[in-house]
Every structure is written in C-alpha cells, then in structure tokens.
C-alpha cells in the first residue's frame, strides 16, 4: 500500500503555530496553487483536527488523507473537488 503523503506538490509546516494561524497559512498557500495540486500540511495544533477538514468542506477542496493519531498531524489537501 502506498503512502498518500509521499509526493505532495507542496508542503506547509505549521508546527508551533496555534489557531487561527495554521488555517490562515493553508488558505494563503492554496490560493497560489493550481486546481488538482496537492498540499501536505504538517501541524501540531489540536484545533487543526477540526479546522482543516472544515476548511476543505467550506472552500470546496478535497481532503485526500489525514493522520491524526500521533504528532505531528498530517493532512493531504487537493485543491478543488
């Protein structure tokens, strides 16, 4: 089974940042991406377990994968649906 986090188009490390900074950085990064590109988000803020999936739903992006069982958390977002 392949690692869904292995080859993202971009990576954003938000470790050490607290809500709302991680989501603000994700939004800024995604704005400059092309539809279909992927972004690996690395975070350690517990609020991201709620905020990143919510951002994807609200902004109509795809949350391809998430790993939130241990720190750092990882989220793979694909721009667009």
From Swiss-Prot:
SUPFAM superfamilies: SirA-like. The gene is tusA. The keyword NAD does not apply. Interacts with IscS. PANTHER family: SULFUR CARRIER PROTEIN TUSA, SULFUR CARRIER PROTEIN YEDF-RELATED. Transmembrane segments: none annotated. InterPro entries: Sulphur_carrier_TusA, TusA-like, TusA-like_sf. Keywords: Cytoplasm, tRNA processing. GO terms for cellular component: cytoplasm. Sulfur carrier protein involved in sulfur trafficking in the cell. Part of a sulfur-relay system required for 2-thiolation during synthesis of 2-thiouridine of the modified wobble base 5-methylaminomethyl-2-thiouridine (mnm(5)s(2)U) in tRNA. Interacts with IscS and stimulates its cysteine desulfurase activity. Accepts an activated sulfur from IscS, which is then transferred to TusD, and thus determines the direction of sulfur flow from IscS to 2-thiouridine formation. Also appears to be involved in sulfur transfer for the biosynthesis of molybdopterin. GO terms for biological process: tRNA wobble position uridine thiolation. It is found in: Cytoplasm. Belongs to the sulfur carrier protein TusA family. Pfam families: TusA. It comes from the Bacteria. Pathway: tRNA modification. The active site is at 19 (cysteine persulfide intermediate). NCBIfam families: PRK00299.1. One of its GO terms (molecular function) is sulfur carrier activity. This is Sulfur carrier protein TusA.
